UniProtKB/Swiss-Prot annotation:
Keywords on record: Coiled coil, Viral capsid assembly, Viral release from host cell
UniProt gene name: 16
Coiled coil: 36-84
Keyword Coiled coil: yes
Tree of life domain: Viruses
Function: Scaffolding protein involved in the icosahedric procapsid assembly. Coassembles with the capsid proteins to form the procapsid, in which the scaffolding protein is found within the external shell of icosahedrally arranged capsid protein subunits.
Family indicated by similarity: Belongs to the L5likevirus scaffolding protein family.
Protein name (record): Probable capsid assembly scaffolding protein
Amino acid sequence: MSDNPTPESTPEAETPEVEKPMEPQGKVFDEAYVQSLRQEAAAARVAKKDAVEAAEARVKAEYEAKLAERDTAYTELQNQLGQAWIELEKVYLSLDAKVPNDKVRAFVEILEGNDRDSIAESVKSRLELVGGFGNKTPSPAFDPSQGRGGKPPIPLNGDPILEAIKAAVGIKK
């Protein structure tokens, strides 16, 4: 093994490079063709963007319409609740003022006001106008044709009948 190579075993010429026939070569396109492809892609992107924006606008419009409808329904319910509260306050204040049960509805119809204080003032003024309820003590039921209420009957002759007539007429002795 010598340090010098022998010429018989090594070729003197360098190996020529071999072309690679198996590798595909890139295609070369014309600039106008590339521009048309780019324009088609841009048109497709713009069309998709427009379609998305139109769909979003349609959904937003539908949602806003439903939201407006619900707001209207909510406002109507709040108004009905307010009216029911006012009516209930009128009934409660009428009952607190000792209005008879059979006259409460008629009394409530003449009351005015939208809050507790104004309704209370209306109740006071209407009670004064009507003259109040329940202030008069009812007289006990009395039917003179039905006897004397458990007392012994008056004899038809003598002084007791004369005294009863004098008492009924108001004659004093």
